[in-house]
Amino acid sequence: MDPNTVSSFQVDCFLWHVRKQVADQELGDAPFLDRLRRDQKSLRRRGSTLGLNIETATRVGKQIVERILKEESDEALKMTMASAPASRYLTDMTIEEMSRDWFMLMPKQKVAGPLCIRMDQAIMDKNIILKANFSVIFDRLETLILLRAFTEEGAIVGEISPLPSLPGHTNEDVKNAIGVLIGGLEWNDNTVRVSKTLQRFAWRSSNENGRPPLTPKQKRKMARTIRSKVRRNKMAD
């Protein structure tokens, strides 16, 4: 096993422990608490995959961090903080909307790069909006925390989430995953639009309805549908 993989996990465990102490003292805001819950699940999966005990890893991670802080000068810390670009955390969803469990009558799941796409194929003829919580840097989506598809009644019918086993994704990864989710939902005659926040930062080529432009495949499908309807109308006449 790569020693850097182990040490990274150990440090992540200790830093999560520190953040948990902050949350326990009620010093964390909603995005902070949201990331804390999601990172806990991710650490459990990583620990299981690596075969490492989280409690032991946390103690070793503490030793690594303490050694680094002991060697780090205040001036170097100031320079590091000053040179790091600041990211913003944007929220379309409340904590309740993000943490709510949901169920699918006809589940479909697809992995697109480092992202997992899930949708309920039983949903038909609904107006659906995509909402997401994510961070932005340099006016571009940096990290997707979670994206969910909601009906007008508030039911969750789809989701895009990062795969813990494949950390890191690009703005293009997110755009492609959104296209897959929209295509899957529209297959059952649902009308899908995205939130204004997503429309602004996830892609720049959406139309005024919050819809991404049709892909060539979607255009061909629409053309076939129109031709089929025209033929049926002629036969009826």
From Swiss-Prot:
Entry's transmembrane regions: none
Free-text description of this protein's post-translational modifications in UniProt: Upon interferon induction, ISGylated via host HERC5; this results in the impairment of NS1 interaction with RNA targets due to its inability to form homodimers and to interact with host EIF2AK2/PKR.
Main location group: host cell
Motif (Nuclear export signal): 137-146
Ranges in a coiled coil: none
Region: Disordered, residue numbers: 205-237
Domain of life: Viruses
Keyword annotations of the record: Eukaryotic host gene expression shutoff by virus, Host cytoplasm, Host gene expression shutoff by virus, Host mRNA suppression by virus, Host nucleus, Host-virus interaction, Inhibition of host innate immune response by virus, Inhibition of host interferon signaling pathway by virus, Inhibition of host PKR by virus, Inhibition of host pre-mRNA processing by virus, Inhibition of host RIG-I by virus, Inhibition of host RLR pathway by virus, Interferon antiviral system evasion, RNA-binding, Ubl conjugation, Viral immunoevasion
Segments for region (PABPN1-binding): 223-230
Any one biological process term the GO annotation gives: symbiont-mediated suppression of host mRNA processing
Compartmental location: Host nucleus; Host cytoplasm
Motif stretch (Nuclear localization signal): 34-38
InterPro entries: NS1, NS1A, NS1A_effect_dom-like_sf, uS15_NS1_RNA-bd_sf
Region listing for CPSF4-binding, in residue ranges: 180-215
Record function comment: Inhibits post-transcriptional processing of cellular pre-mRNA, by binding and inhibiting two cellular proteins that are required for the 3'-end processing of cellular pre-mRNAs: the 30 kDa cleavage and polyadenylation specificity factor/CPSF4 and the poly(A)-binding protein 2/PABPN1. In turn, unprocessed 3' end pre-mRNAs accumulate in the host nucleus and are no longer exported to the cytoplasm. Cellular protein synthesis is thereby shut off very early after virus infection.
Comment text on domains: The dsRNA-binding region is required for suppression of RNA silencing.
Annotated family: Belongs to the influenza A viruses NS1 family.
Subunit structure: Homodimer. Interacts with host TRIM25 (via coiled coil); this interaction specifically inhibits TRIM25 multimerization and TRIM25-mediated RIGI CARD ubiquitination. Interacts with human EIF2AK2/PKR, CPSF4, IVNS1ABP and PABPN1.
Name of the protein described by the UniProt record: Non-structural protein 1
Organism: Influenza A virus (strain A/Japan/305/1957 H2N2)
Highest classification ranks of the organism: Viruses, Riboviria, Orthornavirae, Negarnaviricota, Polyploviricotina
Gene name tied to this protein: NS
